[in-house]
């Protein structure tokens, strides 16, 4: 709320109504936490949070940022998915960094098996750094970059 906050969404009164409360406060949709010193940290977005079957919240952005630090991963999207028993699990779609993977094999042509191994190791590395309910249970390797917005952000709904 204040003079520097937007007045609303252009030609979208419904989105404007959803974003502002009755007192005029703008709700960004960001989720945050505070540490013991009172510092705020943005964890993720309300619209993208994954609620596991046991009720735990998983913030995809946290896992995506960890995956992107791995050499084998160029782009990724983390979402919720159902396993064979209908439970919600953490699922990742990963576009591999073929150049980085190739560099580990002397810049020769790399096989699908080598790509799969490198991505699998990246997922294992991330999983070793998080609590079990946040672990990526299933992943898929995609062969094309993800569609992007005009600001070069990956479109989540693909």
Q: What are these model-derived regions, one by one?
A:
Residues 1-2, 142:
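A secondary-structure boundary/capping signal
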Residues 2, 7-8, 31-130:
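AMP-binding/adenylate-forming catalytic core of the ANL superfamily
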Residues 15-16:
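Short secondary-structure edge/capping micro-motifs at helix/strand boundaries
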Residues 24:
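A structured beta-alpha segment of the ubiquitous adenosine-cofactor-binding alpha/beta core
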Residues 77-80, 123-158:
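Conserved C-terminal "lid"/linker of ANL adenylate-forming enzymes
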């Amino acid at each position: 709320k204040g003079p520097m906050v937007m007045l609303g969404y252009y030609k979208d009164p419904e989105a404007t109504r959803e974003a502002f409360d009755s007192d005029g406060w703008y709700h960004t949709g960001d989720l945050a936490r505070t540490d013991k010193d009172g510092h705020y940290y943005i964890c993720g977005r309300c619209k993208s949070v994954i609620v596991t079957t046991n009720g735990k919240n998983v913030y995809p952005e946290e896992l995506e940022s960890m995956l992107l630090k791995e050499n084998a991963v160029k782009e990724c999207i983390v979402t919720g998915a159902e396993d064979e028993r209908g439970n919600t699990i953490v699922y990742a779609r990963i576009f591999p960094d073929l150049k980085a993977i190739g560099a580990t094999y002397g810049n020769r042509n790399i096989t699908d098996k080598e790509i799969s191994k490198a991505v699998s190791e990246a997922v294992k590395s991330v999983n070793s750094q998080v609590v079990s309910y946040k672990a990526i249970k299933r992943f898929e390797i995609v062969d094309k970059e993800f569609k992007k917005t005009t600001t070069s952000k990956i479109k989540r709904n693909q």
